[in-house]
Curated annotation (Swiss-Prot):
GO biological process: DNA damage response
Keywords, alphabetical: Periplasm, Signal
Thylakoid listed as a keyword: no
Location of this chain's protein in the cell: Periplasm
Claim: tRNA processing is one of the keywords in the record: no
Protein name: 26 kDa periplasmic immunogenic protein
A cellular component term, taken from the record's GO annotations: periplasmic space
Length: 250
């Protein structure tokens, strides 16, 4: 065999080996895909309800005066009385949080009834917000009454929540998984196959939905508070959990 023929055979052999080396992984991947077991994927849902055990109040004190200093002083005095009353009612310091202080000029704008040529500042308003967590729902009406009497004249929101809903959410999780298993069994029976082990599970939890009281309704309650104790209907909070579960098919 001459040198040219030997070189040709060697090159051909190398090419065959190279093609084979690249073909093996592709063959292995294709074989793995064709042997992957059949599966059933379902979504299970679980819900639990719980009566609220805590109220979150968002209140505000608003004062107006000729000067910003006078408005600030009046606002501080009113807020101090409100905070003192909260503490006397058994609200702990950890459940009281003052928010931002808002100072705004009060303008009078030119119209047919005045001789103003441009907007004029006639005074200032100062408002301070306060978030209160009330852990005894029976005291919410009394606390609102006292707050309005002492100076709260603006209301934001009232939410009835659960302080620690972990146990309720865990029960909702159990119900969601049980619901997923029931769905998978129904599908497997309808398809005439057996249900195998769980190979994948993930949670799609939704945030709890506290029992809110609309802002307009809350302001109406505040306005009525000096004459009558504010009635509070606690209702129930709903906790929903969804799970995605994948089963093997036997």
């Amino acid at each position: 065999m001459n040198t040219r023929a030997s070189n040709f055979l060697a090159a051909s052999f190398s090419t065959i080996m190279l093609v084979g080396a690249f073909s093996l992984p592709a063959f292995a991947q294709e074989n793995q895909m064709t042997t992957q077991p059949a599966r059933i994927a379902v979504t299970g849902e679980g819900m639990m309800t719980a009566s609220p055990d805590m109220a979150i109040l968002n209140l505000s004190v608003l004062r107006q005066a000729k000067t910003a200093r006078e408005a600030m002083t009046a606002n501080n005095e009113a807020m101090t009385k409100v905070l003192d009353a909260m503490k006397k009612a058994g609200i702990e310091d950890r459940d009281l949080q003052t928010g931002g202080i808002n100072i705004q000029p009060i303008y009078v704008y030119p119209d047919d009834k005045n001789n103003l040529k441009e907007p004029t500042i006639t005074g200032y308003s100062v408002s301070t917000s306060l978030t209160v967590r009330v852990r005894e729902l029976a005291n919410v009406g009394k606390i609102l009454d006292e707050s309005v009497t002492l100076g709260v004249n603006q209301g934001g929101d009232l939410n009835l929540v659960n302080d620690n809903p972990s146990a309720v959410i865990n029960e909702a999780r159990k119900r969601a998984v049980a619901n997923a298993i029931a769905k998978a069994k129904t599908l497997a029976d309808a398809a005439g196959v057996g249900l195998g082990r769980v190979v994948e599970i993930s949670e799609l939890s939704r945030p709890p939905m506290p029992m809110p009281i609309a802002r307009g309704q809350f302001r109406t309650m505040l306005a009525a508070a000096p004459d009558n104790s504010v009635p509070i209907a606690a209702g129930e909070n709903s906790y929903n959990v969804s799970v995605n579960v994948v089963f093997e098919i036997k």
